[in-house]
Amino acid sequence: MKERTVSDKPRSIVILTGAGVSAESGVPTFRGPDGLWEGHRVEEVATPEAFRRDPDLVLKFYDARRAALETVEPNAAHAALGRLDAEFGGELLIVTQNVDDLHERGGAKRLRHMHGELKRARCTACGARQQAPQTLIDRPACSSCEATGHLRPDIVWFGEMPFHMEEIDRALERADLFVSIGTSGAVYPAAGFVRIASGHGARTLEMNLDPSEGTFYFDEARHGPAGQLVPAWVEEILS
């Protein structure tokens, strides 16, 4: 196990970001207080069964979410993580649960979308992934196999396996610092990342608007808006 102290500068960082980061840019959080996901029950729009049952509803829902990305901009937290990506000389992996493109637009490159991306599509006929057209409801042809009517959002729906898990697990085992930003601490497997990293000797830090369900697993917690906390923390790391 790695021997670390609080004052040590990290050599390998894994960062997990969730809906709280994008919420400050105006992206709706995953689920409202009424339990609905932008007016829909989750099982209506975010499961493979929903897509088989009513593909038009699902495609319209994601087309609207994709179009909404054009109305939002990266915030100070995205920009700070982009700066960290550019200037941090050690190992870095930013893992996001968010399906928007605000991290990319904020400058992040060492980035993995574990729940997929709104701006990507996947062909259910041949499996090819591609840039999503402006709308999927029109049933465009796959750019790889040219079959029509088989493109779905390249999003991890409930009951499906998150992307990049082997790479994420390896990074968590190597990390000497794990940071969780804007997450609920309730959705697995991401909610278990802190224990994996800690179990391999990493220091752990939570930055969240309010304490998450897993705050007690972290060595340190800072609570407040991500747009304030993250730039200050990045300055500490790079100083």
PLM region spans:
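Conserved catalytic core of sirtuin-type NAD+-dependent deacylases
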Residues: 1-239
